[in-house]
Amino acid sequence: MSNTYGLERLGIINPGTIYRNLPMARLVEIALARGEGLLASNGALSVNTGKYTGRSPHDRYIVDTPAVHDSISWGAVNQPVSEATFERLYSRLTAYLQGKDLFVFDGFVGADPAYRMPIRIVNEYAWQNLFVHQLFIRPTAEELAGHEPRFTVICAPGFKAIPEEDGTRSEAFIILNFDRRLVIIGGTSYAGEMKKSIFTVMNYLLPEQGVCPMHCSANMGPAGDTALFFGLSGTGKTTLSADPERYLIGDDEHGWSDKGIFNFEGGCYAKCIKLSAEHEPQIWNAIRFGSVLENVMVDPDCRIIDYDSDALTENTRAAYPVDFIPNAVIPGVGGHPQTVVFLTADAFGVMPPIAKLTREQAMYYFLSGYTSKLAGTERGVTEPKATFSTCFGAPFLPRSPMVYANLLGERIARHNASVYLVNTGWTGGPYGTGRRMSLPYTRAMVRAALNGELDKVEFTPDPVFGFLVPKACPGVPAEILNPRNTWAETEKYDAMARKLASLFRENFAKFKDVPVSIQEAGVVG
């Protein structure tokens, strides 16, 4: 009798062949043999996820039980679903899996052994199992032998919910059950749902252990100094943390404990629309055999990749293990950060390319989480629009925003970290008339912030937003540092700045229990 690896404990009975922790090459072979994708000219496995090319936030639910009810910030992000609804759907899902070959990944989330969690992911598709093999932390043979998962994800894209029977909004569903330590995903092939489900789990569990979970990338300088880059999808977390002059800790999800910071993952999930070897050489070179390309156009005959094409989606992605980046820190841990960067892609074109924040301003802008929702990262978003995503990660935060803000604020204060706001969005006008901020200039400004060069320049307070804008920065033309100077008609800039300021005030009004010092640290003009 073949080994079932304990799947019967999940209610999965009579499966076909179960493949557990296959090596990368075997998963690629099987995916190709099953017609799940094709091999691109650089050796990466290229797949198409169908109509779901981004996360489906409106199809994500948390099972409402007495044990978690008072800990969850219920609402449009954390939608409740009953235990009965979950069990009904779960029963049909496990029946669907009977007779099917399944791919199991047993590994970990959390690079710090003190906080890492053993996880299991069960996949219907070989390519998705390759994805999680590359994205999470892979076990040693010894660790695998004694592996007991504390949380399990079952992902079956071919199984579709029936909304009128299952109580879902659509055929797609992502349901987190904290009591059962189980996540079920169906109806969508977008691999990011698995990654972000585990992130949400960590965001729920870690605050109880005194750890601040963060939607950020992190890197380390030659002297061991670390930096964090917060931001929503498409704002530059992966791009800016992959710096040949520094060592990459991780590109998306981290924890900040009393010992320092640690990566949750063992891989990267990079946006690759318009990727170029010139501007992002580390990411370009990391996409090779063993990597997964999601919804990237590949010529079916010559297999040449067209990174410029958004024919399938703007949200094209590449997944690869962190050690495909030559200067990655293994394991992904570092000391307490000296610099914290908040990234925003401002579609209004009024935010400066870089500004320094006081601690109170840092809390204001962290809670605000302003950016522009960029095309493709969520279904239905086809052009950028202003959005406020609390703590730069509202879709993944099950608890009250103040839980995360207090944890971060306490650590910034205790370790005296410098905080900067960096705009990777538009300058010279709003989206449509302005232009996207130059990546080389952004890199130069971030470099100046990290190496202390900005400590030596003069700053001037922004009359509307209050933060401090540098008058000079090495490697950057002085005229672009003040965004008002980049607009042809300054009165239009002033009107747009006032418009954005009013949106900030309107959004922040929902934070009733925030100290007055933080409320007053925001918009001033």
Curated annotation (Swiss-Prot):
Cited function: Involved in the gluconeogenesis. Catalyzes the conversion of oxaloacetate (OAA) to phosphoenolpyruvate (PEP) through direct phosphoryl transfer between the nucleoside triphosphate and OAA.
Gene name of the encoded protein: pckA1
Organism, as annotated: Moorella thermoacetica (strain ATCC 39073 / JCM 9320)
Sites where the protein binds ATP: K196, H215, G231, L232, S233, G234, T235, G236, K237, T238, T239, E280, R317, T442
Entry's EC annotation: 4.1.1.49
GO molecular function, one term: ATP binding
Cofactor names: Mn(2+)
Primary subcellular site in the record, as a coarse category: cytoplasm
Listed name of the protein: Phosphoenolpyruvate carboxykinase (ATP) 1
